[in-house]
Amino acid sequence: MGRVLIIGAGGVGTVVAKKVAQNSDVFTEIMLASRTKSKCDKIASEITNVKIQTAAVDADNVPELVALMKSFKPELVINVALPYQDLHIMDACLEAGVNYLDTANYEPLDEAKFEYSWQWAYKQRFEEAGLTAILGCGFDPGVTGVFTAYAAKHHFDEIHYLDIVDCNGGDHHKAFATNFNPEINIREITQKGKYYEDGQWRETEPQEIHKPLTYPNIGVRESYLLYHEELESLVKNYPTIKRARFWMTFGQEYLTHLRVMQNIGITRIDPVLYNGVEIVPIQFLKAILPNPGELGENYTGETSIGCRIRGIKDGKEKTYCVWNNCSHQAAYQETGAQGVSYTTGVPATIGALMFFKGLWRKPGVYNVEEFDPDPFMEQLMTQGLPWHEQFDLDLEL
């Protein structure tokens, strides 16, 4: 049954490999591949109950990817590499006849802009090949889309207002660090904000709109409106939505560091000449910042991510909140990774489970909310990300 190729051996790749191995009744063999094979070997050395192989692969090199896929013959690729590499991996999957799952949408290397159009354009090719591509199956995007689908299926006739709220209430005890790839993280939060309202996308300056929100078990945190990719697919798949926004918490110290780095130009994504060599400042910054995959040991506190929804059921307005809280220490004790990596890697594993069980499998390219949310929601409870819900309360939004 489940031969799976995992591409990427950072914090999320670590979690995916270990969670896949925990589900050995479904997954029978793993190939873990990354540009740096030694990182894969280290992860593989900690997995004993499932057959696991490792390989070095350049995820920008389609022929190399195809050769690996044809050699190992996986049924599914779990892509937890960089968003710049999504299209290369999808191309390789089509050539090798392999199904596909990722956790983040494509972003061009030379432009801080992400959208689904590039990947949605693959729909016909995946249909014709009889292959499934599951997009954005982390937490946000991913679980947030499943939460929305679950709310639409069970609690609303029409969803009108959707706010996705993401709080990291943890402390990694570093002056400055990002919780996932620094280059991707900084590009995401320094670009302009955007939200959907009354059929239009409205743009804001970075961190222009913010307000205090209360997060379960954490308390009040200042939350900033920014653009996040799942908004694009959710307003497409739920056309009754009148407004959709995404909020994320940042501490003042984090924002001050970020502002200084922007002001001195080290977050630039265009090449500069240094000692006769072209370097990209943000890539240099990534090299000297703490590795997100190594933050877990001293990380305390928890994350809280969820959806706050207002809409209509049986002609009456109602509100609904659904969320998960994840302890950094519990995540580290189970997988050796911090909570942000854990909350991305576990849903990717569940998405793969849904595929192998035949529950999320149909030719084409799909976002997670286009599948039945119920079996995924059940697996969240048993795989380490239990969720909670409340009805008819003040959404603060």
Model-flagged regions — what are they?
Residues 69, 75-79, 100-101:
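N-terminal Rossmann-like NAD(P) cofactor-binding module of classical short-chain dehydrogenase/reductase
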Residues 12:
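Hydrophobic/small residue at the entry helix of a nucleotide-binding pocket
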Residues 153-397:
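C-terminal catalytic/substrate-binding lobe primarily of soluble NAD(P)-dependent oxidoreductases
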Residues 47-61:
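Rossmann-fold cofactor-recognition segment
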Residues 59-73, 85:
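Conserved Rossmann-fold cofactor-binding substructure of NAD(P)-dependent oxidoreductases
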Residues 104-131:
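Rossmann-fold NAD(P)-binding glycine/threonine-rich loop
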Residues 36-38:
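Helix N-cap at the beta1-alpha1 junction of Rossmann-like dinucleotide-binding domains, i.e.
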